Structure formats: structure tokens, C-alpha cells
Curated annotation (Swiss-Prot):
GO terms for cellular component: cytosol. Pfam families: Formyl_trans_C, Formyl_trans_N. It comes from the Bacteria. Belongs to the Fmt family. This is Methionyl-tRNA formyltransferase. The lineage of its organism: Bacteria, Thermotogati, Thermotogota, Thermotogae, Thermotogales. It is an enzyme of class 2 (transferase). One of its GO terms (molecular function) is methionyl-tRNA formyltransferase activity. Its EC number is 2.1.2.9.
């Protein structure tokens, strides 16, 4: 079976590398345009393009998919297209040229849209999964080919969940391709939910919320891009939220550093309904360190308050 692979970021590159390692016949790759990346903002190839070039697979970055993409299909004659985080909606007539299947990081119809991994964590889901579906014109609305669910740990951060999506997603993709064609099942559109794009405003944590909600917010963006708040008007990032203690002391302002633990190094922060243990804090231009290290360095102490600027 001749495969056209479409994808752009590091996540998609892991899938392309997997397919090649498993000896699937990837005949061509389509990725988005190269963009400036890194501190120097140097124009660099997309991670998917780098993998394709590494293995000598023809890679294309068309501006107009309905023109150039159709030409690629005509020249390379793929039997199927596999799409992983390509980053653009696919439209007719390209959609009709070959069967196109997308690997989506949620159990559709839940969490349609661009940020399903983070939104599931943020909402406190304990089960999520991977869906392979046939692409249609509606966003993530196509018929389902295969799904695989897996559990999330209570304190599991995005970085760990991301790795699970690569492991279980690539395994599911292999199963799909080995058994293709498979029976398709229409989605129940009445049960659809949406996972909107992550905006900068989403990255600020509010300690006047319940402790579980604050923990899930920190988990969803740990280790990247990291949630933000302000300490003495300095923007800091927080990582490693886990243990929650009950606390009914209403006289303590939410966001207050109640204590810093010597054994674990955690900061214990007041929320509206409890105390949340947070392992790491990161100051501008510095690496993340434990709250205890920050205290020993004179950067933070008990009684200080995390606040968001209005």
C-alpha cells in the first residue's frame, strides 16, 4: 500500500518515523512551510520535513493544496493519505482524490478541534484516547475507523500524556494500516464537544479557583509552555502540581504561599478551598527550581502571594 503522509510538528514527525521504521511504504510527504524557530528565529524545516529528508522521501510544502496537492497525488499515486497534526483544514477536491484518514488525540466526538490533549487534562478527564477517522469537510466530524482509550493518572502532566499519545497512537495506526480497509462508524454529533486553540490568556492560573481546577490547569501545560502567575509583579511559571490538602481558613488569601516543605521542596499554596502542593517555580530567564531552592536563594518566602495582574 502506497502512503501519502501529511503532518508538520514534532508530534507528527514521531508518527512518520514510526511508519518508516515499520517498513510501511511512504511514497511522499506533505508538510507546512518552514517557519522561524528557536531563540535565533532561524528559518528551519518542519520536524516532519526533517524526518522525510533523513530517509530520502520526497517532501512537499504546497501553498495551494487543491492545486499542488492534486499534482503530488497524480505523480506519486498513493492509495491512502495519513494526516497527523498537519495544521490546515483539507477541502474538496483534494479530499476526494484519495481516502484521507486523520489521527486525532481524543475519543471523538469529544474534544474536536486543535487542542484536545491539553483541554482533556485541564478538564480533569481520567480517560482519554486516540481516534483514527476518515476526514470529511467538517472539523473532526468524519466516520470513525478505530479508537483506543487509556487512563490518565491524577497528577499526570502534559509531557507524560503526550508520550502516551505517541505510543498508543502509533500502535493504533499500525493496526489500522495492517487491517485496512476497516468498517467505519458514524460519529454521534449530539455528543460532540470542542477543544479550542490555546490562547495566551489560557496560561494564567487563578488561585481563587478550587484546588483540583488549579492543579489540572498546571498539569495541562507542564512542561510546555508552562502556566504563569505573578509574584511581586514578576511573571513566573509553575510546574509539578499534585497533592491537595483540605483547608478551611478563609482568612488566608488565595495564592498565598502558606509553607515551603523542607523534605519535598514543595511550595504549599492556598486556593479557594484547600492547599495545593507545587514542586517547581521558574523565574524569568532562569531554569525551574524547587520552591525550597527558591527560598534558600532569597527569591520567595512564606506569606508571599501569587496574583494575576488585571
Amino acid at each position: 500500500m502506497r502512503i501519502l503522509f501529511m503532518g508538520t510538528p514534532e508530534f507528527a514527525a514521531s508518527y512518520l518515523d514510526f511508519l518508516i521504521q515499520k517498513k510501511f511504504n511512504v511514497v511522499a510527504v506533505i508538510s507546512q512551510k518552514d517557519k522561524p524557530r528557536g531563540r535565533g528565529q532561524k528559518l528551519l524545516p518542519t520536524p516532519v520535513k526533517e524526518v522525510a529528508q533523513k530517509y530520502g522521501i520526497p517532501v512537499f510544502q504546497p501553498s495551494k493544496l487543491n492545486e499542488e496537492g492534486l499534482e503530488i497525488i497524480e505523480n506519486y499515486r498513493p492509495d491512502i493519505g495519513i494526516v497527523v497534526a498537519y495544521g490546515r483544514l483539507l477541502r474538496k477536491p483534494f479530499l476526494d482524490a484519495i481516502p484521507l484518514y486523520n489521527v486525532h488525540t481524543s475519543l471523538l466526538p469529544k474534544y474536536r478541534g486543535p487542542a484536545p490533549m491539553q483541554r482533556a487534562i485541564e478538564n480533569g478527564e481520567r480517560v482519554t484516547g486516540v481516534t483514527i477517522f476518515k476526514i470529511s469537510e467538517g472539523m473532526d466530524e468524519g466516520d470513525i475507523a478505530l479508537q483506543r482509550a487509556f487512563e490518565l493518572e491524577e497528577c499526570e502532566p502534559f509531557g507524560s500524556v503526550y508520550e502516551k499519545f505517541i505510543k498508543y497512537g502509533t500502535e493504533l495506526l499500525q493496526e489500522f494500516l495492517r487491517n485496512y480497509p476497516v468498517t467505519l462508524t458514524p460519529q454521534d454529533h449530539s455528543k460532540a464537544t470542542y477543544a479550542p486553540k490555546i490562547e495566551k490568556k489560557d496560561l494564567y492560573v487563578d488561585f481563587s479557583k478550587p484546588a483540583v481546577e488549579v492543579r489540572n490547569k498546571i498539569r495541562a501545560y507542564d512542561p510546555t509552555p508552562g502556566v504563569r502567575t505573578f509574584l511581586n509583579d514578576i511573571e513566573v511559571k509553575l510546574y509539578g502540581a499534585c497533592e491537595i490538602e483540605s483547608n478551611s481558613q478563609e482568612n488566608i488569601e488565595p495564592g498565598t504561599v502558606v509553607r515551603i516543605e523542607k523534605q519535598s521542596g514543595d511550595g504549599v499554596i492556598k486556593t479557594i478551598d484547600g492547599l495545593l502542593h507545587i514542586k517547581y517555580i521558574q523565574f524569568p530567564g532562569k531554569n525551574k527550581i524547587t520552591f525550597l531552592s527558591a527560598k534558600n536563594g532569597g527569591l520567595i518566602k512564606e506569606g508571599m502571594v501569587f496574583r494575576n495582574l488585571d
